[in-house]
Protein backbone atom coordinates (compact mmCIF):
# COMPACT_ATOMS: atom_id res chain seq x y z
CA UNK A 1 0.00 0.00 0.00
CA UNK A 2 1.48 3.35 -1.09
CA UNK A 3 0.50 6.48 0.81
CA UNK A 4 1.49 9.96 -0.39
CA UNK A 5 1.77 12.61 2.32
CA UNK A 6 2.46 16.33 2.05
CA UNK A 7 6.08 16.90 3.01
CA UNK A 8 5.02 19.58 5.49
CA UNK A 9 2.64 17.41 7.53
CA UNK A 10 4.39 16.80 10.86
CA UNK A 11 4.50 13.21 12.10
CA UNK A 12 2.96 11.96 8.84
CA UNK A 13 5.83 9.62 7.96
CA UNK A 14 5.92 8.26 11.51
CA UNK A 15 2.19 7.56 11.69
CA UNK A 16 1.31 6.45 8.17
CA UNK A 17 4.29 4.08 7.98
CA UNK A 18 2.26 1.92 10.38
CA UNK A 19 -0.20 1.39 7.54
CA UNK A 20 1.95 1.16 4.40
CA UNK A 21 4.80 2.61 2.36
CA UNK A 22 4.99 6.38 2.76
CA UNK A 23 6.30 8.89 0.22
CA UNK A 24 6.51 12.57 1.17
CA UNK A 25 5.82 14.93 -1.75
CA UNK A 26 5.40 18.68 -2.33
CA UNK A 27 1.86 19.95 -2.01
CA UNK A 28 1.94 22.61 -4.72
CA UNK A 29 2.08 20.86 -7.13
CA UNK A 30 1.85 17.15 -6.29
CA UNK A 31 4.15 15.33 -8.77
CA UNK A 32 1.99 13.47 -11.30
CA UNK A 33 4.36 10.51 -11.43
CA UNK A 34 4.00 9.94 -7.68
CA UNK A 35 0.23 9.58 -8.06
CA UNK A 36 0.43 6.81 -10.65
CA UNK A 37 0.36 3.92 -8.18
CA UNK A 38 -0.69 5.66 -4.96
CA UNK A 39 -3.50 4.20 -2.87
CA UNK A 40 -4.03 7.26 -0.65
CA UNK A 41 -3.20 10.98 -0.72
CA UNK A 42 -2.83 13.20 2.35
CA UNK A 43 -2.77 16.94 1.60
CA UNK A 44 -2.94 20.43 3.08
CA UNK A 45 -4.83 23.47 1.81
CA UNK A 46 -2.25 24.26 -0.91
CA UNK A 47 -3.26 21.21 -2.97
CA UNK A 48 -6.27 21.43 -5.28
CA UNK A 49 -7.88 17.99 -5.19
CA UNK A 50 -10.21 17.44 -8.13
CA UNK A 51 -10.82 15.40 -11.27
CA UNK A 52 -7.84 16.98 -13.04
CA UNK A 53 -5.51 15.72 -10.31
CA UNK A 54 -6.91 12.23 -9.72
CA UNK A 55 -8.81 11.09 -12.81
CA UNK A 56 -7.51 7.71 -13.93
CA UNK A 57 -5.41 7.27 -10.78
CA UNK A 58 -5.64 4.41 -8.28
CA UNK A 59 -6.15 6.68 -5.26
CA UNK A 60 -8.96 5.33 -3.08
CA UNK A 61 -8.79 7.83 -0.19
CA UNK A 62 -7.97 11.52 0.24
CA UNK A 63 -7.35 13.15 3.59
CA UNK A 64 -6.77 16.84 4.19
CA UNK A 65 -5.04 17.76 7.43
CA UNK A 66 -6.97 21.03 7.51
CA UNK A 67 -10.24 22.32 8.87
CA UNK A 68 -11.19 24.03 5.60
CA UNK A 69 -12.17 21.94 2.58
CA UNK A 70 -12.73 24.47 -0.22
CA UNK A 71 -9.60 23.12 -1.98
CA UNK A 72 -11.22 19.68 -2.35
CA UNK A 73 -13.93 18.82 -4.89
CA UNK A 74 -15.87 16.55 -2.56
CA UNK A 75 -18.70 16.02 -5.04
CA UNK A 76 -16.29 14.58 -7.60
CA UNK A 77 -14.58 12.39 -5.00
CA UNK A 78 -17.94 10.95 -4.00
CA UNK A 79 -18.88 10.37 -7.63
CA UNK A 80 -15.54 8.62 -8.21
CA UNK A 81 -15.98 6.43 -5.13
CA UNK A 82 -12.96 7.91 -3.35
CA UNK A 83 -13.08 8.12 0.44
CA UNK A 84 -12.49 11.50 2.08
CA UNK A 85 -11.80 12.98 5.49
CA UNK A 86 -10.86 16.43 6.78
CA UNK A 87 -9.67 17.59 10.19
CA UNK A 88 -12.35 19.97 11.51
CA UNK A 89 -11.21 22.14 14.38
CA UNK A 90 -7.61 20.93 14.24
CA UNK A 91 -6.11 24.43 14.13
CA UNK A 92 -8.91 26.39 15.82
CA UNK A 93 -6.90 27.11 18.97
CA UNK A 94 -3.96 28.30 16.88
CA UNK A 95 -6.10 30.78 14.94
CA UNK A 96 -7.67 32.12 18.14
CA UNK A 97 -4.22 32.68 19.62
CA UNK A 98 -3.10 34.42 16.40
CA UNK A 99 -6.03 36.83 16.74
CA UNK A 100 -5.20 37.50 20.39
CA UNK A 101 -1.52 38.10 19.60
CA UNK A 102 -2.55 40.62 16.94
CA UNK A 103 -5.09 42.42 19.12
CA UNK A 104 -2.69 42.71 22.05
CA UNK A 105 0.00 44.12 19.78
CA UNK A 106 -2.38 46.72 18.34
CA UNK A 107 -3.71 47.58 21.81
CA UNK A 108 -0.21 48.24 23.10
CA UNK A 109 0.76 50.25 20.02
CA UNK A 110 -2.39 52.38 19.97
CA UNK A 111 -2.88 52.64 23.74
CA UNK A 112 -6.31 51.14 24.28
CA UNK A 113 -7.76 48.55 26.65
CA UNK A 114 -9.33 45.51 25.00
CA UNK A 115 -12.12 45.60 27.59
CA UNK A 116 -13.18 48.94 26.12
CA UNK A 117 -13.69 47.41 22.68
CA UNK A 118 -16.56 45.40 21.21
CA UNK A 119 -15.50 42.47 19.03
CA UNK A 120 -17.74 41.30 16.21
CA UNK A 121 -17.17 37.66 15.28
CA UNK A 122 -18.37 36.60 11.83
CA UNK A 123 -18.65 32.82 11.76
CA UNK A 124 -19.12 31.14 15.13
CA UNK A 125 -17.86 27.63 14.51
CA UNK A 126 -14.75 25.90 15.84
CA UNK A 127 -12.65 29.08 15.70
CA UNK A 128 -15.27 31.75 16.32
CA UNK A 129 -16.82 29.88 19.24
CA UNK A 130 -13.48 29.44 20.99
CA UNK A 131 -12.59 33.07 20.34
CA UNK A 132 -15.88 34.19 21.88
CA UNK A 133 -15.25 32.19 25.07
CA UNK A 134 -11.74 33.53 25.56
CA UNK A 135 -12.73 37.12 24.89
CA UNK A 136 -15.67 36.93 27.27
CA UNK A 137 -13.44 35.38 29.94
CA UNK A 138 -11.54 38.68 29.82
CA UNK A 139 -14.73 40.71 30.09
CA UNK A 140 -14.68 41.78 26.44
CA UNK A 141 -18.07 42.27 24.80
CA UNK A 142 -18.69 40.15 21.71
CA UNK A 143 -21.29 40.35 18.94
CA UNK A 144 -21.96 37.20 16.93
CA UNK A 145 -22.97 36.79 13.28
CA UNK A 146 -23.64 33.32 11.88
CA UNK A 147 -26.69 33.17 9.57
CA UNK A 148 -26.70 29.35 9.13
CA UNK A 149 -26.67 28.81 12.90
CA UNK A 150 -29.26 31.53 13.45
CA UNK A 151 -31.62 29.95 10.92
CA UNK A 152 -31.16 26.52 12.51
CA UNK A 153 -32.25 28.01 15.81
CA UNK A 154 -28.93 27.31 17.55
CA UNK A 155 -28.46 28.79 20.98
CA UNK A 156 -26.87 32.23 20.89
CA UNK A 157 -27.68 35.89 20.36
CA UNK A 158 -26.91 36.11 16.64
CA UNK A 159 -26.95 39.50 14.95
CA UNK A 160 -26.92 40.65 11.35
CA UNK A 161 -23.65 41.52 9.66
CA UNK A 162 -24.89 45.10 9.27
CA UNK A 163 -25.37 45.30 13.05
CA UNK A 164 -21.77 44.21 13.60
CA UNK A 165 -20.51 46.80 11.11
CA UNK A 166 -22.38 49.52 12.99
CA UNK A 167 -21.59 48.45 16.56
CA UNK A 168 -18.28 46.56 16.62
CA UNK A 169 -14.83 48.09 17.04
CA UNK A 170 -13.20 44.87 15.83
CA UNK A 171 -14.55 42.75 12.99
CA UNK A 172 -12.93 39.32 12.68
CA UNK A 173 -13.88 36.74 10.04
CA UNK A 174 -13.90 32.98 10.71
CA UNK A 175 -16.12 31.51 8.01
CA UNK A 176 -15.66 28.78 5.42
CA UNK A 177 -15.36 29.90 1.79
CA UNK A 178 -18.59 29.38 -0.13
CA UNK A 179 -18.52 30.76 -3.67
CA UNK A 180 -22.27 30.45 -4.21
CA UNK A 181 -25.50 29.49 -2.51
CA UNK A 182 -27.64 31.03 0.23
CA UNK A 183 -24.67 31.36 2.58
CA UNK A 184 -22.15 32.63 0.05
CA UNK A 185 -19.08 34.03 1.81
CA UNK A 186 -16.93 35.04 -1.17
CA UNK A 187 -16.59 38.83 -0.81
CA UNK A 188 -18.75 38.74 2.31
CA UNK A 189 -16.78 41.87 3.15
CA UNK A 190 -17.43 43.57 -0.17
CA UNK A 191 -16.89 47.16 -1.26
CA UNK A 192 -20.19 48.25 0.29
CA UNK A 193 -19.37 46.74 3.69
CA UNK A 194 -15.80 48.00 3.69
CA UNK A 195 -16.95 51.53 2.85
CA UNK A 196 -19.30 51.46 5.88
CA UNK A 197 -16.69 50.44 8.46
CA UNK A 198 -16.29 53.05 11.18
CA UNK A 199 -12.99 54.96 11.19
CA UNK A 200 -10.53 53.12 13.42
CA UNK A 201 -12.22 49.72 13.03
CA UNK A 202 -9.87 46.75 13.31
CA UNK A 203 -10.52 44.30 10.45
CA UNK A 204 -9.10 40.77 10.77
CA UNK A 205 -9.24 37.99 8.19
CA UNK A 206 -7.71 34.67 9.20
CA UNK A 207 -10.07 32.29 7.38
CA UNK A 208 -9.96 32.44 3.56
CA UNK A 209 -8.63 35.28 1.42
CA UNK A 210 -11.64 35.83 -0.87
CA UNK A 211 -13.97 36.34 2.11
CA UNK A 212 -12.68 39.93 2.06
CA UNK A 213 -12.63 41.81 -1.26
CA UNK A 214 -8.94 42.71 -1.35
CA UNK A 215 -9.32 45.23 -4.17
CA UNK A 216 -12.04 47.11 -2.28
CA UNK A 217 -9.99 47.02 0.91
CA UNK A 218 -6.96 48.46 -0.87
CA UNK A 219 -9.15 51.18 -2.38
CA UNK A 220 -10.28 52.31 1.07
CA UNK A 221 -6.77 52.20 2.53
CA UNK A 222 -5.36 54.15 -0.43
CA UNK A 223 -8.02 56.80 0.19
CA UNK A 224 -6.46 57.37 3.61
CA UNK A 225 -9.54 56.33 5.57
CA UNK A 226 -8.31 55.00 8.91
CA UNK A 227 -8.60 51.27 9.47
CA UNK A 228 -6.35 48.82 11.27
CA UNK A 229 -6.05 45.65 9.19
CA UNK A 230 -4.74 42.19 10.01
CA UNK A 231 -4.56 39.78 7.06
CA UNK A 232 -3.27 36.23 7.24
CA UNK A 233 -5.04 35.19 4.05
CA UNK A 234 -5.06 36.89 0.67
CA UNK A 235 -6.82 37.19 -2.66
CA UNK A 236 -5.17 35.52 -4.50
CA UNK A 237 -2.59 33.22 -2.94
CA UNK A 238 0.31 32.80 -3.23
CA UNK A 239 0.54 35.89 -5.48
CA UNK A 240 -0.83 38.42 -3.01
CA UNK A 241 -1.28 42.12 -3.74
CA UNK A 242 1.98 43.72 -2.59
CA UNK A 243 0.42 47.19 -2.45
CA UNK A 244 -2.19 45.90 -0.02
CA UNK A 245 0.48 44.27 2.14
CA UNK A 246 2.27 47.64 2.38
CA UNK A 247 -0.85 49.22 3.86
CA UNK A 248 -2.01 46.60 6.36
CA UNK A 249 -0.89 46.69 9.98
CA UNK A 250 -0.12 42.97 10.19
CA UNK A 251 0.37 40.72 7.18
CA UNK A 252 1.31 37.05 7.33
CA UNK A 253 1.57 34.12 4.92
CA UNK A 254 -1.54 32.06 5.75
CA UNK A 255 0.05 30.68 8.92
CA UNK A 256 -2.51 31.60 11.60
CA UNK A 257 -3.27 27.93 12.19
CA UNK A 258 0.35 26.79 12.04
CA UNK A 259 1.07 25.73 15.61
CA UNK A 260 2.84 22.43 16.05
CA UNK A 261 -0.17 21.23 18.04
CA UNK A 262 -2.60 22.31 15.32
CA UNK A 263 -0.67 20.67 12.51
CA UNK A 264 -0.19 17.51 14.58
CA UNK A 265 -3.94 17.37 15.29
CA UNK A 266 -4.60 17.59 11.56
CA UNK A 267 -2.22 14.71 10.85
CA UNK A 268 -3.59 12.50 13.61
CA UNK A 269 -7.21 13.14 12.62
CA UNK A 270 -6.69 12.06 9.00
CA UNK A 271 -4.50 9.15 10.14
CA UNK A 272 -7.27 7.88 12.39
CA UNK A 273 -9.83 8.36 9.61
CA UNK A 274 -7.73 6.47 7.06
CA UNK A 275 -6.89 3.65 9.46
CA UNK A 276 -10.62 3.19 10.03
CA UNK A 277 -11.27 3.39 6.27
CA UNK A 278 -8.97 0.42 5.60
CA UNK A 279 -10.38 -1.57 8.50
CA UNK A 280 -7.52 -1.18 10.98
CA UNK A 281 -8.70 1.63 13.28
CA UNK A 282 -6.02 3.22 15.46
CA UNK A 283 -6.06 6.08 17.97
CA UNK A 284 -3.17 8.46 18.63
CA UNK A 285 -2.52 10.46 21.81
CA UNK A 286 -1.23 13.88 20.77
CA UNK A 287 1.02 14.30 23.80
CA UNK A 288 3.00 11.19 22.80
CA UNK A 289 4.15 13.01 19.66
CA UNK A 290 4.87 16.56 20.83
CA UNK A 291 8.31 17.59 22.09
CA UNK A 292 8.94 19.42 25.36
CA UNK A 293 8.25 23.16 25.01
CA UNK A 294 11.04 25.73 24.90
CA UNK A 295 9.95 27.28 28.19
CA UNK A 296 9.45 24.81 31.02
CA UNK A 297 7.70 27.04 33.55
CA UNK A 298 7.48 30.62 34.67
CA UNK A 299 6.18 32.32 37.81
CA UNK A 300 3.62 35.13 37.80
CA UNK A 301 3.35 37.34 40.87
CA UNK A 302 0.19 39.37 41.40
CA UNK A 303 -2.97 39.83 39.34
CA UNK A 304 -3.28 39.43 35.58
CA UNK A 305 -3.60 42.75 33.75
CA UNK A 306 -3.47 43.44 30.01
CA UNK A 307 0.28 44.26 29.82
CA UNK A 308 1.08 41.06 31.72
CA UNK A 309 -1.19 39.01 29.48
CA UNK A 310 0.46 40.55 26.44
CA UNK A 311 3.90 39.54 27.71
CA UNK A 312 2.76 35.97 28.37
CA UNK A 313 1.06 35.68 24.98
CA UNK A 314 4.03 37.09 23.11
CA UNK A 315 6.42 34.90 25.06
CA UNK A 316 4.72 31.97 23.35
CA UNK A 317 3.90 33.68 20.03
CA UNK A 318 4.42 37.26 18.85
CA UNK A 319 2.68 37.76 15.49
CA UNK A 320 5.33 40.29 14.44
CA UNK A 321 7.80 37.45 13.94
CA UNK A 322 5.70 36.39 10.92
CA UNK A 323 4.88 39.87 9.62
CA UNK A 324 8.44 40.99 8.94
CA UNK A 325 9.55 37.98 6.85
CA UNK A 326 6.58 38.29 4.48
CA UNK A 327 7.28 41.97 3.85
CA UNK A 328 10.89 41.14 2.97
CA UNK A 329 10.00 38.68 0.21
CA UNK A 330 6.58 39.85 -0.99
CA UNK A 331 6.32 39.79 -4.76
CA UNK A 332 9.16 37.31 -5.24
CA UNK A 333 7.93 34.16 -6.97
CA UNK A 334 7.81 31.11 -4.72
CA UNK A 335 8.69 32.91 -1.48
CA UNK A 336 5.17 32.85 -0.01
CA UNK A 337 5.15 29.05 -0.11
CA UNK A 338 8.73 28.90 1.19
CA UNK A 339 7.70 30.83 4.30
CA UNK A 340 5.01 28.24 4.94
CA UNK A 341 7.22 25.26 4.13
CA UNK A 342 10.07 26.43 6.35
CA UNK A 343 7.88 27.77 9.14
CA UNK A 344 9.58 28.18 12.50
CA UNK A 345 8.14 25.92 15.19
CA UNK A 346 5.33 27.62 17.09
CA UNK A 347 3.53 26.29 20.16
CA UNK A 348 0.14 26.96 21.75
CA UNK A 349 -0.43 28.67 25.10
CA UNK A 350 -1.10 25.31 26.71
CA UNK A 351 2.61 24.54 26.35
CA UNK A 352 3.47 27.26 28.90
CA UNK A 353 3.29 26.21 32.56
CA UNK A 354 2.55 29.26 34.73
CA UNK A 355 2.74 29.26 38.52
CA UNK A 356 0.54 32.08 39.82
CA UNK A 357 0.68 33.67 43.26
CA UNK A 358 -2.85 35.01 42.64
CA UNK A 359 -5.67 32.45 42.51
CA UNK A 360 -7.85 34.56 40.22
CA UNK A 361 -4.98 34.98 37.78
CA UNK A 362 -4.50 31.21 37.65
CA UNK A 363 -8.20 30.63 37.01
CA UNK A 364 -8.33 33.22 34.24
CA UNK A 365 -5.20 31.91 32.55
CA UNK A 366 -6.65 28.40 32.52
CA UNK A 367 -9.83 29.77 30.93
CA UNK A 368 -7.63 31.34 28.27
CA UNK A 369 -5.85 28.06 27.56
CA UNK A 370 -2.63 28.36 29.55
CA UNK A 371 -1.36 25.54 31.75
CA UNK A 372 -1.67 27.58 34.95
CA UNK A 373 -1.73 26.64 38.64
CA UNK A 374 -2.18 28.62 41.84
CA UNK A 375 1.00 28.47 43.90
CA UNK A 376 0.79 30.88 46.88
CA UNK A 377 3.94 32.71 47.87
CA UNK A 378 5.09 31.49 51.28
UniProtKB/Swiss-Prot annotation:
It catalyses: 4-phospho-D-erythronate + NAD(+) = (R)-3-hydroxy-2-oxo-4-phosphooxybutanoate + NADH + H(+). InterPro entries: D-isomer_2_OHA_DH_cat_dom, D-isomer_DH_CS, D-isomer_DH_CS1, D-isomer_DH_NAD-bd, Erythronate-4-P_DHase, Erythronate-4-P_DHase_dimer, NAD(P)-bd_dom_sf, PdxB_dimer_sf. The active site is at 208, 237, 254 (proton donor). Substrate binds at residues 45, 66, 258. One of its GO terms (biological process) is pyridoxine biosynthetic process. GO terms for cellular component: cytosol. Coiled coil: none annotated. SUPFAM superfamilies: Formate/glycerate dehydrogenase catalytic domain-like (SSF52283), NAD(P)-binding Rossmann-fold domains (SSF51735). Pathway: Cofactor biosynthesis; pyridoxine 5'-phosphate biosynthesis; pyridoxine 5'-phosphate from D-erythrose 4-phosphate: step 2/5. Its main location: cytoplasm. Keywords: Cytoplasm, NAD, Oxidoreductase, Pyridoxine biosynthesis. It is an enzyme of class 1 (oxidoreductase). NAD(+) binds at residues 146, 175, 232, 257. Its EC number is 1.1.1.290. GO terms for molecular function: 4-phosphoerythronate dehydrogenase activity; NAD binding; protein dimerization activity. CDD domains: ErythrP_dh. It is found in: Cytoplasm. Homodimer. Belongs to the D-isomer specific 2-hydroxyacid dehydrogenase family. PdxB subfamily. This is Erythronate-4-phosphate dehydrogenase. It comes from Klebsiella pneumoniae (strain 342).
Amino acid sequence: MKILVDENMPYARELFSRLGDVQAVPGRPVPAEALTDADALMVRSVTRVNEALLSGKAVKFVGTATAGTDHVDQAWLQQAGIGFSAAPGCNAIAVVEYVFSSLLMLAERDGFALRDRTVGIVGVGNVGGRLQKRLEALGIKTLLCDPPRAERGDEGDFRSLDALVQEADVLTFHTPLYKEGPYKTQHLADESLISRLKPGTILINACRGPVVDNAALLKRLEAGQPLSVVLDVWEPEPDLNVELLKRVDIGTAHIAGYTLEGKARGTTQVFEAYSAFIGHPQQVALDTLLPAPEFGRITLHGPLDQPTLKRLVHLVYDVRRDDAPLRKVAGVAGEFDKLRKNYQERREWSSLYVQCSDAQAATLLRQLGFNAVHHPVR
